[in-house]
């Protein structure tokens, strides 16, 4: 059984005094990602103390992952985001493809290939 979807779970620690800037950049990232045909989900979750964030991303297939990673959101806005928060962990669920997989591994993402489950 295969599943072409790829999911990211990105954990961020928001820098002290940077919440408003963090939220502003997140809004820009959402506005850019919504324009990507292969993006199925791009959801942000804040902890109760508003110091930690989880970003859950879902892409239709590895080509959509590569398009996102080489697109303007990642190129232009991720550097701005990293001025407001530090990356705590980055997990990838599914096969991101060879090129994107190499880039993701290079930034410390842990990749979990699809093993088994419901299709869809």
Residue locations for each model-derived region?
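Active-site-flanking beta-strand signature of metal-NTP-handling nucleotidyl enzymes
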Residues: 6-12
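Short amphipathic alpha-helical/adjacent loop interface patches that line ligand
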Residues: 26
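Basic/polar N-terminal segments that are highly enriched at the extreme N-terminus
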Residues: 1-4, 117-120
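Short, surface-exposed ligand-recognition loops at beta-strand->loop->(often short) alpha-helix junctions
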Residues: 13-23
């Amino acid at each position: 059984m295969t599943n072409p979807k790829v999911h990211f779970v990105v954990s961020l620690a928001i820098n002290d005094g940077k919440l408003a800037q963090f939220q502003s950049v997140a809004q820009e990232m959402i506005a850019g990602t919504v324009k990507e045909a292969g993006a199925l989900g791009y959801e942000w979750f804040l902890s109760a103390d508003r110091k930690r964030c989880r970003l859950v991303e879902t892409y239709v297939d590895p080509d959509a992952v590569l398009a996102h990673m080489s697109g303007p959101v990642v190129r232009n806005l991720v550097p701005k985001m990293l001025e407001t928060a530090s990356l705590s962990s980055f997990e990838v669920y599914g096969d991101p493809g060879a090129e994107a997989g190499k880039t993701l591994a290079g930034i410390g993402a842990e990749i979990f290939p699809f093993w088994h489950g419901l299709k869809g």
